[in-house]
Amino acid sequence: MCIRDRIEDNPKMILKEKKNCSMGVAMQMVADGRADAMISAGSTAALVMGGTLIVKRIKGVKRPSLTPVMPGLNNMYILLDGGANVDCRPDMLRQFAVMGSVYMNKIMGVDNPKVGLLNVGAEEEKGRELEQETYALLKNSTLNFTGNVEARNAALGEVDVVVTDGFTGNIYLKTVEGMGKFMKASLKKIFFRNLGTKIGAMFTMKGIKEISKQMDYRETGGSPVSYTHLTLPTKLEV
C-alpha cells in the first residue's frame, strides 16, 4: 500500500483534525491487522507520532528511531537515529543498538552485526557524557559492539550499525547526501573541462556511473521507522 499526504501538513493536524487522511487510515489498518505494513511520502513527524499512538511500540521500547540504510564501501549499513529524537538518553541509544542489530540480522541477513557508536574519536573516553555512558552500556551488553566509530570511517565497512542521537544522526545523514551531490558535480566538472578530459571520461564513464549510483540517496529513497511490529519481532530484549 502506498500512502501519500502533503508533507507540509502539521503532524497534530494530520492525526487529530484529519482522522480520515490516508496516513491515519493506513496506520489504523496496520494496527487492526488488515495490513502488514505501510509506506508514506508524507510528514515524517506525523508518521513517527502516529506510529507511536496508533500502531503502538513494542513493549519496553522507549522511543522510535528513523533507520536510514546507508551506502558503504563494501556493504550497506544502517544509522540509528536518523532524526526522530533530537534529545536522547544512554538507555535509548542502547535500545537503538538492539533494534539496529535485529534489523540487520533479520531483514538484511547479516550474522552477528557489528555495532559502532558514532563519536569524535575511537578511544573509549571520547565524547560527551551521553557517548561515554552509552559506551559503557554497549560494552557490557551481549551485542557485537566494536567501540566508537568516527564519521569518516563509518562507510568503510567497520560496522553494520551506527548508533547516535537524532540530532547528530540527521546532520551525518544530510552530510552524506550532500557529499554524494558534491562528488557527482565535481566529477562532471572535471571530466567535461576540455576535449582531453572528455575523451578520458568515455573510458571511465561506466565506473563513474556506478559510483554516482552508489552515492545517490534516491537509491534508498526512504527509511524504516524502527520501534513497532512493522520492523521488529514482537518479542525484543531491550
Task: Set out the residue ranges of the language-model regions.
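Conserved small/polar residues in nucleotide/adenosyl-binding loops
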Residues: M1-D5, T228-T234
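Phosphate/nucleotide-donor binding subsite
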Residues: R4-A35
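Short glycine/serine/threonine-rich phosphate/pyrophosphate-binding segments
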Residues: S22-M23, T44-G51, G127, I171-Y172
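A glycine- and small-aliphatic-rich helix-loop capping segment at beta-alpha/alpha-beta transitions
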Residues: A46, G50-T67, E133-L138, K181-F182
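Glycine-rich phosphate/nucleotide-binding loop
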Residues: V55-R63, P71-L79, E158-V162, G166-L232
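Short, glycine-/small-residue-rich phosphate/pyrophosphate-handling segment
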Residues: P71-M104, R218-G222
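Glycine-rich phosphate/diphosphate-binding loop of Rossmann-like nucleotide-binding domains
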Residues: D87-G147
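Flexible, glycine/charged-enriched surface loops at secondary-structure junctions
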Residues: I107-V115, N144-R152, R193-M202, Y217-S223
